[in-house]
Amino acid sequence: MSGRKAQGKTLGVNMVRQGVRSLSNKIKQKTKQIGNRPGPSRGVQGFIFFFLFNVLTGRKITAHLKKLWRMLDPRQGLAVLKKVKRVVASLMRGLSSRKRRSYEVLTVQFLILGMLLMTGGVTLVRKSRWLLLNVTSEDLGKTFSVGTGNCTTNILEAKNWCPDSMEYNCPNLSPREEPDDIDCWCYGVENVRVAYGKCDSAGRSRRSRRAIDLPTHENHGLKTRQEKWMTGRMGERQLQKIERWLVRNPFFAVTALAIAYLVGSNMTQRVVIALLVLAVGPAYSAHCIGITDRDFIEGVHGGTWVSATLEQDKCVTVMAPDKPSLDISLETVAIDGPAEARKVCYSAVLTHVKINDKCPSTGEAHLAEENEGDHACKRTYSDRGWGNGCGLFGKGSIVACAKFTCAKSMSLFEVDQTKIQYVIRAQLHVGAKQENWNADIKTLKFDALSGSQEAEFTGYGKATLECQVQTAVDFSNSYIAEMEKESWIVDRQWAQDLTLPWQSGSGGVWREMHHLVEFEPPHAATIKVLALGNQEGSLKTALTGAMRVTKDTNGSNLYKLHGGHVSCRVKLSALTLKGTSYKMCTDKMSFVKNPTDTGHGTAVMQVKVPKGAPCRIPVMVADDLTASVNKGILVTVNPIASTNEDEVLIEVNPPFGDSYIIVGTGDSRLTYQWHKEGSSIGKLFTQTMKGAERLAVMGDAAWDFSSAGGFFTSVGKGIHMVFGSAFQGLFGGLSWITKVIMGAVLIWVGINMRNMTMSMSMILVGVIMMFLSLGVGADQGCAINFGKRELKCGDGVFIFRDSDDWLNKYSYYPEDPVKLASIVKASFEEGKCGLNSVDSLEHEMWRSRADEINAILEENEVDISVVVQDPKNIYQRGTHPFSRIRDGLQYGWKTWGKNLVFSPGRKNGSFIIDGKSRKECPFSNRVWNSLQIEEFGTGVFTTRVYMDAVFEYTMDCDGSILGAAVNGKKSAHGSPTFWMGSHEVNGTWMIHTLETLDYKECEWPLTHTIGTSVEESDMFMPRSIGGPVSSHNHIPGYKVQTNGPWMQVPLEVKREACPGTSVVVDGGCDGRGKSTRSTTDSGKIIPEWCCRSCTMPPVSFHGSDGCWYPMEIRPRKTHDNHLVRSWVTAGEVHAVPFGLVSMMIAMEVFLKKRQGPKQILVG
């Protein structure tokens, strides 16, 4: 038994070691097998595929993987990647050839392709803490594995990649959350953004079709007759020129038609050639004959100066006894080398659009591009909640920025008055043939430095011209606008008001870029941003009415105007007639061209002298063939024939009606019957109207009616334009009261005359005389008289010393009382309890019209009364604008008549106007700055001022009654209740006079400010209470008076000590504090004052409560308990009544029904 046990004994075996030994043997066998295979091992291939998978799916590349990649044999790695490349190329060829493959093969290849890269599709790039998903149009509706989750894009706007791209967040949604108002979303992965290009296959991006509504330039041009852009008159003018040339040159016209017929091979070519030749024909006209508008100066003595204003496309013919006639015209007005002032962009390109968003209650969204000057940004709010990545419903912050690049711009050049050249053309009427005219044409150039110049004509002497370039067209408020190859003269204010991006001429960032960028309404996490299309069409349409300018094509920076005028003086004393000693031509002459109407009331003819030259050609215009007295005027004075067979051009001015033009003497004379339409009286009226039109265009530079000179030297408006200077010349020596009495007598006589024609004539003359005696000459432009404290602007005048007239001589009305009552009702219903006036003028309107507004409210059964309280000339700021009207009110005649007699009663609700801030109606619940002056009307005794409501809240004061002017070293900023006069001393502007009649808290607008480069702390009067932000609002040694006694109105600032006090400069004096009155609370004078570094004499405020010192000047020995301190914390007008116009209406009543003297006096 023991033997069996020994024989069957079991031995212990270590199975772990046995398994390791077995596995080791297998690995050695497999390694040997792999090593014997050619090419990269499967391990290398697997590692490369795994590495590519991590790269393409956006997984993090660990440090261990990077180390293995660096250890990889380059030859084996390249071999694997080449295989991958061959597989991808094969798949692409298969797709392009549309061949059918087996399901198994396609499955394997697509799996490999998905691991490598969906070629041409999505790519994932890590950008800081963000994963950036780049997609194209091929990825519409696809879902991609990103990190530990997946993202889906459904972006219809995604196309081909280009600089016009979008980038924004892909919200991360909860697992069961459905997307809402988003086109990119993720599940299980944070911080993913999507980017895509928006260009089509041709590289074009979508633009907004919206056109900008630009203000038209019409009625903003220069005050001159001109060729205007898009007025539709140029074709008409050229046709008129062609018509006149055809009538006057029939032989050449027939020749042109014959050439066209022979040269052209078909009818179309013949018509085109004929039109081209005929269009060029008028260019060969000369003298003033072929010019549309022409004026004559007749009967002027040659030794005196003749005043004339020259315009382009017009001509003046000067005739004097024993002098040759002279044609002068303005050839061109050119501007040399203007400086570029600004650029206006009308076509922009947007690129690199980025958007960021935030959920509600998580703060504001921000982009780094917001701080870059070349980006247009918009910040707004979008609806967020479940379905777009937010846990709370509400408004979330969203901001979008796009890089702005201007593709096309219009340059604006500033015109330097000293660089303007006027080219004047002068030509003598000597009867020479057209081919010899060049010798008789002289060209003179005038600029700002030119004096008088002489035009010398061989054999005839010299004509002297002196042109006042400084008083010609005013370019100070104009720019030259150049857009591609076209140029215009435009109004400076119009150009600055264009709603287009702009930059200064020296470059820099574009301002107001938002005008060419359209931000569509936001979605949850994105905003569509589009560039507006090319606005060239809108801009050219807006330029309607602007004067055309032509740029010189030879490379110079010279611009030629198609309009303009210049005032000149002409002297003919050095001109002499040629051939006065020649004998008369007696041989038979002939008409080469029969007498033809020039269109200016004259007749022109061409006469041929066969022999007997040199001789004088006798020409006369008579009533009949037997008359011997010349009834016409020779424009071509003393026509002479220099050689035999000479052809002489002669121009005459026949009388009105039938006449005969007689050339030569005796039986061989030439006769031609002539008829001139019109009459001498009609000519007088025509010339007067012509002069009136010219005066309206020229202003004070206009010479006279019909170029006669010296009768009308200045203009106003209306009657003053035509009759003003004549009235002054006839009655200038009479006193004012005498002229008024004469006018009244003429009206009285006219009323009592039985003959209707004489009655109307006398009344008209009397009314004109009284009007010219009592009215204002309506000055144009802006001017300021510092001695009289008078500021003139536009056609209005206001005088500060008479500023109380704004409350006494002016009546204030709402533009529409019913509308204002409706606005009061709407505002009250929205919880606004009242209104604070901006200044005394608005308060006066409410005070005088409260009853009328209450009557309207009462008629419509509105339980509200407008209650006007006394503000003591202190007008503080409210916080709301007017509410818009929801329903209109009615206002009948019955209520109107009742309101004239009875005042409406008080209602339960009160709309408080001004007064103090009380608990029932605090300033925080009042309307403010919601009325502006609309226009100025006329009345018999007072001027009416109409105010209209505005619905936008603004801090700026109404600019309708503000003015600013500078003249040399003096300047002024003024309004009806404020005047600040400044002067310059050693290069520093300082206030010398400051007066204010009321306290107001609107801000002086920059549009009515001179010298805006100033730190607000260096100003004297604070900005928040109407102090102009100007370097002229400054007093050396005194800072901004935020605690000045500004409420002590009326207030005047003077450079003098308060009565009974003295001020010394002491470095140990107290610092700035609240302004202090010079007397104690008991009225005792505080004699001693000091300041640390103020300038002398000291500044003092003289107000309604005594004299005050500014914040820098402090009392020396008075206890604080007795001081009185300031409690302020400042954070086109017709000046003369025009009511006499209504008298003319009343005259019609008198004329229709005869009134006796007694009835007139009583009635």
Swiss-Prot record:
* Region (Fusion peptide), start-end ranges: 383-396
Q: Which Gene3D superfamilies match?
A: 1.10.10.930, 1.20.1280.260, 2.60.40.350, Flavivirus envelope glycoprotein M-like, Flavivirus polyprotein propeptide domain, Tick-borne Encephalitis virus Glycoprotein, domain 1, Viral Envelope Glycoprotein, domain 2, Viral Envelope Glycoprotein, domain 3
UniProt organism field: Yellow fever virus (isolate Peru/1899/1981)
Protein's recorded name: Genome polyprotein
Q: Extracellular side: which ranges?
A: 126-244, 286-730, 752-757, 779-1163
Q: Name one GO molecular function term.
A: helicase activity
* Disulphide bonds in the chain: C288-C315, C345-C406, C359-C390, C377-C401, C467-C568, C585-C615, C782-C793, C833-C921, C957-C1002, C1058-C1107, C1069-C1091, C1090-C1094
SUPFAM superfamilies, from UniProt? E set domains, Viral glycoprotein, central and dimerisation domains
